[in-house]
Swiss-Prot record:
Binding-site list for Mg(2+): D172, D174, D411
Signal peptide residues on this chain, from the entry's feature table: none
Description of pH dependence: Optimum pH is 6-6.5.
Species the sequence originates in: Saccharomyces cerevisiae (strain ATCC 204508 / S288c) (Baker's yeast)
E.C. number(s) listed in UniProt: 3.1.3.99
Protein name in UniProt: IMP-specific 5'-nucleotidase 1
Additional facts recorded: Present with 1590 molecules/cell in log phase SD medium.
Keyword Transmembrane helix: no
PANTHER family linked: IMP-SPECIFIC 5'-NUCLEOTIDASE 1 (PTHR28213:SF1)
Binding residues annotated for IMP, in chain numbering: D172, D174, D180, T208, D376, K384
Gene that specifies this protein: ISN1
Amino acid sequence: MSSRYRVEYHLKSHRKDEFIDWVKGLLASPFVLHAVSHEGDYNDDLATTQRVRSQYADIFKDIEGLIKDKIEFDSRNMSQDEIEDGASSQSLNILGQSRLNLLVPSIGTFFTELPLEQAFLWEDSQRAISARRMVAPSFNDIRHILNTAQIFHFKKQENLHNGKVLRLVTFDGDVTLYEDGGSLVYTNPVIPYILKLLRCGINVGIVTAAGYDEAGTYENRLKGLIVALHDSTDIPVSQKQNLTIMGGESSYLFRYYEDPEEDNFGFRQIDKEEWLLPRMKAWSLEDVEKTLDFAERTLNRLRKRLNLPSEISIIRKVRAVGIVPGERYDEASKRQVPVKLDREQLEEIVLTLQNTLESFAPSRRIQFSCFDGGSDVWCDIGGKDLGVRSLQQFYNPESPIQPSETLHVGDQFAPVGSANDFKARLAGCTLWIASPQETVNYLHRLLETD
């Protein structure tokens, strides 16, 4: 489900982010205590705003300390190899649990410290959070504060002598780089920022659920980007080649190339032996096929049970299976009209598919990802965490890029079932955005010179 669907968001437990909800709860007390009107007395109102700002800032400072303690605790509790293999602090309790784990049991791994107090004060200056009396700090407020803190961290690392600078930025496609179902046209405002990342020597990967085993489809959807990259004379070809596409979440890898003699450019597929992680190579083809067969049967049963229109079709690919909307001819308008799935139908399908596959033996021996794309539902073999980890290894096999040097930008981070960017949190730092314009705004702040 793309981030634009926010109606009744907080009524659905599978759509909640427990950490953000916990932060909202902490901020509720100062909001309620100071949610008073001063009947037009500007000085009293200003004093109240300052008190609220100070209390909010203190809360974020305390959370900042809890995150720092958790990072130190986790570093003692697990080795780097265990982190790379996908182990979480929830599964390793050699030394018990950090205080933040006890307060928020579902909390994941933090790869960097987050200057939350500084981020709050910056966001407050832009959004006047402390000045509000009727609307408490919201999910979106906290999402923006977390994103800004991550940006501030990487900006700080640039100025440190031995800082862990950013080496890899990965992006989702739909709703992150372009509108849902769209493409990256030449006029897209995100393109200059992607070029600047490459110009700065930062690797760029587009990790998308769209799975195709040939380059043409990706070249068409990203035409504006690759034309702009080809036309950029101030970026060496060696750095242009640091643009990659990971398709099907972790199934197909393509790398940008230029052939000056033939004046050709585009994407070239990379042989799987060059980038597959050892754990992915260990998956049996039989388990993959059985998982997709089982998922396809489940989708067929759901189509009958939910009495879906015949135009709704099920598509089977080599590494994925999904249920997608269709079209029918409308006699009144004399044209084809879309036949869509309702939001409730999409959620029923993705949650049922996820739960049934979790109890299916072959699918437990591999990794799969079920997600709701806003108009369709898919089950992919692999996941975005593996896609990001594969890129970390591919760009520098001798010295793989670390999670603390990686930033994934995406719009689907709901914690259960319906969001495929969520798993990317296992492989690196993240920015949770809600529109392509937000992506542009954050990249501008990341790349602007102080």
